[in-house]
């Protein structure tokens, strides 16, 4: 059970590690915010002030600054060093030669340009927003490309302002603007890992707020813009990485659940507010509060008059306040607003704000603020799995990490359950507020009010104490993750399968250019090898919170400076930015020596997990002790524990949990919902893979093994397929549409998916305004036929359909091989493939043998019950038998299976199952014969070749196999679910009505047409029709020429080669007579061969069509027999196959005389 969960978790995390979209991941990248800023704008976005002076809007990053140092890095880019001009890698722009489609790519002319250099490197600010500076950049080598952030500005907009509200605000925005392309002068550099695995200097900025700006601009929106005077010819983009300084709005794995429940309870129209207002709106409650206030005022006055109380100024003010507070409950408009804004807000929003502060404080470095989000981020997992092949301890570390992740997930989930339980309880307590607030008036009920308030405080403190402990443990775990996995990694093809890597690489680039080179890859550390020469020191921004200990604070640690992430500069290895050169010397030494696995770090993580589990158990009792409610009857800890255990059981044993706790209808709906979601993604992935296989089938990268499988099982040789036929057909249609008056109303791509007859109908309707081709006049038909023939569309359509059939066959063969256990390596390695095929055949035979054994037993028992049933019918009659059959015989064997679409009895179903097994055995035999012949032995083409070779016995044998298989296929199509042509025998004899049988016969006609239209062999008829017509036309022309030349009417086919040669000698002149004779004879022989071959193939296709028709008619005859037995009116509607038998060439020429 737990093993299955662990395996599922491992597979999920492996897949998740491939979702980063980057070729390389920087050492300090544990989930940075990344996006692109384009140098181009849509024309409608730009405002032109005057010639050559355009103003463009600021790009909203959708993030807000949080007051911490704002660190933004601009990715380096160099075409010379191997970076690609794609949206996933490009980080440069060019102020020249851009086109509309260059939003995320450089113009072709700019790709190989050098980076821009400047006459004055201190003046890189081009077209700055400062109105006093409108000078152009001082470029010395134009044309060139801008890199490292030159021309890119960020804007921290002033609160409640919109920099894009007008052109003036776009050019002179309110807020803080800084240029990201300035040379860094603060003693540090940015470094980034390029797509080739090399560390390169990058552009960027580390902006630290001055004075009051930190609080003034906190939570202000962040904008970006590449500033230029003329945008219409720009191309390219900058790829930005925000390392710190913004509030991460990406959802936490468990935050969605928390926000959902909080919104339902405490939202604007939440349950708590509605229930609270319903209570105070109740007339009975208002009367009770009025009575209580009246009694309280009366008792206070009476007690004062008799001297029972001493009303001091303080006591009087307290009593007046009590009366005022309770009186507010009588005001339905102000009651919720008053108590929510001045009391309940501290227990709802106040707790949420404190938790947010705690979470921000625990986020001591890059990555998600949530510990769980950090641990399962694609960047973290990529670095984790990179350890597998660089150190023999890597596998152990990965297993320990996943075990730790498993426990951390459940501990945080348990903490979330505690928090949500406390939140719900707070809501329940607030709902009871209108009742308990009234209890503060009298001494006898005051204790109830005080307990109510204590409970409210207790449940508000629980999540604060709980998440304070989690934050403390989180900081420890974060530090270890940063120190252990704080190195760069890059994708490398692994295993390197040569052309296969390129195939799947182009497949992924079609989806997203940022996805990499191949799906066969693994992450490896950078540098992959140890050695001091592979590590480089530099002054960099330290990427995590730390305390700077220098000479000024050695004696007084309180005076040491605390630096937030990316606030302070220190000398460190750029490959290991989290490790201090002195404190972490041992770990640095391990990395330099090639030891990437730090087991002491994972040990500390497990210690932290143990502490976290203990803290979870004590947090509630601590909150109860502080609030003074530890002795109350409500034991929230037990409630939380029960909630957690139930949820844990659901995760560990989902099937048992659903079966025990949820009713069957709910279970089926949940299962259906899961299946629907699963099928949605499966369908998307399958469509994607099928599209890839379609492209692969027509490309040079097509798998030879799959092509041989297509030839063997589907009778299509890839050599006979015109790979560009679909494109040629579409181009031919497009050319024809240009000559039509309303041709622009049709789309060539859509028409190219149709058959030739459908295409002809569409063009007839478009050109002549009729319904279809049949509605044309004789002259119009002749005109249209001529234009279609001139465009050669019929032949192009035939070739395109043949190519599509080949693509379908390629996909089916690929899937069938995978279904037989022949995987990716088996499709490329013959020995492995043979072993996999043998294993599949053995397994299939074993399965059929077992099914046959079970079927024989069931058949014997069914026969026995049938005898009992017959005897009972003879003794008591049919009606009495039906009444008592359930008790006297095994009725389930002979009664209808109402879950069966054909309403068969179980015994009838057994017979059909036996036929299905016979079909499987027949298919295995056919596959064996096809494997021996290395061809599709049932295809008309193969049978025609055997016929021509004189192997008549083989033809008869294979035709007999084809006939048996065809009968099974026709039955399968006629009896398939939905609208079966024939129901069970008992139903047809006893229950079927006249209208049902008529519908069955009509349905048989429809399915016959569908079967004929979809049969993969019959679909080739158009291809061979064209071949036959061309050969016939050429031969008739040759025969006519010979007839006219030699004045003979009795020319035989065997004479024609000699007569052709003589005719060429009689009519041709020059030295090339022999060459022309050879050419004419070759053409004649090719025409004869094509005629005879196509004639034989077409006759075989007609035989197949007739066999299908005969079998469907046999089923129709059966239905009519049932009708006759039931004394119903005759409804005979057989199918007539309008086939043809083509004559041999000798007979055809003889008929021409």
From Swiss-Prot:
It comes from the Bacteria. One of its GO terms (biological process) is protein secretion by the type IV secretion system. Its main location: membrane. The chain crosses the membrane at residues 289-309, 393-413, 422-442, 457-477. Residues 1-18 form the signal peptide. GO terms for cellular component: plasma membrane. It is a multi-pass membrane protein; Lipid-anchor. The keyword rRNA-binding does not apply. Keywords: Cell membrane, Lipoprotein, Membrane, Palmitate, Signal, Transmembrane, Transmembrane helix. A lipid is attached at residue 19 (N-palmitoyl cysteine). This is Uncharacterized lipoprotein RC0146. It is found in: Cell membrane. A lipid is attached at residue 19 (S-diacylglycerol cysteine). Belongs to the TrbL/VirB6 family. InterPro entries: Conjugal_tfr_TrbL/VirB6.
């Amino acid at each position: 059970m737990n093993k299955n969960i662990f395996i599922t978790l491992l597979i999920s995390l492996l897949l998740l590690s491939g979702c980063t979209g980057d070729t390389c991941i920087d050492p300090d990248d544990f989930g940075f915010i990344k996006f692109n800023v384009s140098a181009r704008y849509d024309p409608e976005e730009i405002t032109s002030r005057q010639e050559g002076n355009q103003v463009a809007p600021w790009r909203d990053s959708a993030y807000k600054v949080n007051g911490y140092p704002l660190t933004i890095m601009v990715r380096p880019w160099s075409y010379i060093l191997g970076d690609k001009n794609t949206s996933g890698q490009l980080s440069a722009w060019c102020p020249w030669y851009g086109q509309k489609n260059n939003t995320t790519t450089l113009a072709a002319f700019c790709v190989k340009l050098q980076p821009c250099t400047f006459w004055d490197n201190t003046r890189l600010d081009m077209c700055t927003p400062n109105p006093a500076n409108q000078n152009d950049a001082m470029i010395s080598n134009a044309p060139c490309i801008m890199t490292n952030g030159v021309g890119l500005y960020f804007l921290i907009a002033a609160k409640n302002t919109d920099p894009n509200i007008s052109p003036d605000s776009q050019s002179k925005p309110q807020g803080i603007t800084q240029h990201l392309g300035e040379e860094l002068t603060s003693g540090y550099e940015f470094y980034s890992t390029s797509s080739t695995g090399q560390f390169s200097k990058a552009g960027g900025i580390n902006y630290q707020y001055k004075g009051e700006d930190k609080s003034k601009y906190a939570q202000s929106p962040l904008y970006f813009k590449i500033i230029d005077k003329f945008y219409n010819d720009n191309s390219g983009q900058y790829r930005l990485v925000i390392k710190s300084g913004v509030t991460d709005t990406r959802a936490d794995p468990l935050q969605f659940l928390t926000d959902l429940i909080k919104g339902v309870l405490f939202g604007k129209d939440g349950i708590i507010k509605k229930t609270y207002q319903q209570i105070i709106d109740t007339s009975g409650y208002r009367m009770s509060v009025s009575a209580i206030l009246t009694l309280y005022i009366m008792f206070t006055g009476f007690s004062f008059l008799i001297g029972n109380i001493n009303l001091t100024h303080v006591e009087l003010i307290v009593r007046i306040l009590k009366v005022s507070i309770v009186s507010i409950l009588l005001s339905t408009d102000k009651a919720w607003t008053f108590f929510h804004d001045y009391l309940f807000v501290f227990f709802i929003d106040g707790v949420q704000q404190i938790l947010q502060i705690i979470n921000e404080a625990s986020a001591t470095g890059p990555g998600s603020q949530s510990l769980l989000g950090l641990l399962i981020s694609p960047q973290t997992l990529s670095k984790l799995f990179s350890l597998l092949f660089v150190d023999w301890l890597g596998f152990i570390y990965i297993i320990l990490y996943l075990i730790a992740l498993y426990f951390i997930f459940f501990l945080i989930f348990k903490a979330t359950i505690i928090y949500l339980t406390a939140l719900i309880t707070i809501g329940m307590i607030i709902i009871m507020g209108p009742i308990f607030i009234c209890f503060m008036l009298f001494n006898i009920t005051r204790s109830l009010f005080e307990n109510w308030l204590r409970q409210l405080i207790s449940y508000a403190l629980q999540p604060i104490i709980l998440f304070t402990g989690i934050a403390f443990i989180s900081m420890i775990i974060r530090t270890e993750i940063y120190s252990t996995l704080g190195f760069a990694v890059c994708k490398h093809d692994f295993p390197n399968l040569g052309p296969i890597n390129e195939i799947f690489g182009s497949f992924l680039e079609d989806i997203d250019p940022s996805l990499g080179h191949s799906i066969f890859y693994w992450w490896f550390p950078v540098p992959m090898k140890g050695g001091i020469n592979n590590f480089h020191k530099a002054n960099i921004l330290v990427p995590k919170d730390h305390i700077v200990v220098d000479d000024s604070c050695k004696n007084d640690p309180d005076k040491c400076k605390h630096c937030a992430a990316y606030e302070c500069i220190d000398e460190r290895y750029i490959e290991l930015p989290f490790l201090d050169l002195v404190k972490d010397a041992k770990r640095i030494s391990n990395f330099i020596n090639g030891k990437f696995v730090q087991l002491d770090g994972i040990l500390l993580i497990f210690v932290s997990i143990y502490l976290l589990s203990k803290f979870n158990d004590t947090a509630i009792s601590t909150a109860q002790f502080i609030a003074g409610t530890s002795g109350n009857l409500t034991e929230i800890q037990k409630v939380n524990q029960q909630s957690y255990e139930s949820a844990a059981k659901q995760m560990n044993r989902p099937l048992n949990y659903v079966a025990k706790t949820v009713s069957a209808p709910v279970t089926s709906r949940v299962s259906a919902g899961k299946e629907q979601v699963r099928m949605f993604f499966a369908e998307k992935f399958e469509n994607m893979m099928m599209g890839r296989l379609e492209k692969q089938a027509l490309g040079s990268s097509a798998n030879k093994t799959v092509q041989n499988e297509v030839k063997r099982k589907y009778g299509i040789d890839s050599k006979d397929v015109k790979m560009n036929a679909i494109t040629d057909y579409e181009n031919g249609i497009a050319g024809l549409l240009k000559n039509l008056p309303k041709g622009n109303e049709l789309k060539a791509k859509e028409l190219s998916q149709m058959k030739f007859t459908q295409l002809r109908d569409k063009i007839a309707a478009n050109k002549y305004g009729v319904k279809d081709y049949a509605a044309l006049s004789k002259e119009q038909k002749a005109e249209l036929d001529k234009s279609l023939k001139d465009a050669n569309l019929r032949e192009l359509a035939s070739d395109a359909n043949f190519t599509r059939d080949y693509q379908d066959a390629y996909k089916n063969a690929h899937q069938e091989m995978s279904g037989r256990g022949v995987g990716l390596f088996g499709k490329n390695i013959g020995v492995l493939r043979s072993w996999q095929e043998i294993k599949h055949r053995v397994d299939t035979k074993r399965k059929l043998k077992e099914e046959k054994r079970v079927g024989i037993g069931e058949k014997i028992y069914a026969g026995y019950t049938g005898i009992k049933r017959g005897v009972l019918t003879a003794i008591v009659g049919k009606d009495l038998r039906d009444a008592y059959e359930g008790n006297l015989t095994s009725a389930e064997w002979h009664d209808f299976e109402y879950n069966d679409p054909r309403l068969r009895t179980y015994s009838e179903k057994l017979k059909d199952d036996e036929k299905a097994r016979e079909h499987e055995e027949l298919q295995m035999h056919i596959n064996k014969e096809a494997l021996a012949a290395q061809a599709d032995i049932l295809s008309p083409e193969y049978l025609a070749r055997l016929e021509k070779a004189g192997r008549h016995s083989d033809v008869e044998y294979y035709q007999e196999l084809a006939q048996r298989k065809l009968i099974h296929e026709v039955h399968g199509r006629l009896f398939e679910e939905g609208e079966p042509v024939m129901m069970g025998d008992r139903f047809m004899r006893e229950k079927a009505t006249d209208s049902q049988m008529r519908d069955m016969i009509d349905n048989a006609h429809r399915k016959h047409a569908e079967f004929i239209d979809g049969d993969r062999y019959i679909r080739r008829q158009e291809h061979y029709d064209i071949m036959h017509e061309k050969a016939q036309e050429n031969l008739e022309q040759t025969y006519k020429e010979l007839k006219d030349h030699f004045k003979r009417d009795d020319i035989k086919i065997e004479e024609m080669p000699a007569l052709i040669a003589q005719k060429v000698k009689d009519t041709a002149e020059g030295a090339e007579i022999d060459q022309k004779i050879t050419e004419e004879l070759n053409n004649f022989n090719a025409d004869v061969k094509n005629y005879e071959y196509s004639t034989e193939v077409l006759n075989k296709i007609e035989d197949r069509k007739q066999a299908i028709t005969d079998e469907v008619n046999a089923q129709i005859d059966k239905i009519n027999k049932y009708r006759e037995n039931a004394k119903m009116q005759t409804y005979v509607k057989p199918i007539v196959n309008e086939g043809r038998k083509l004559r041999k060439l000798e007979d055809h020429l003889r008929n021409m005389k």
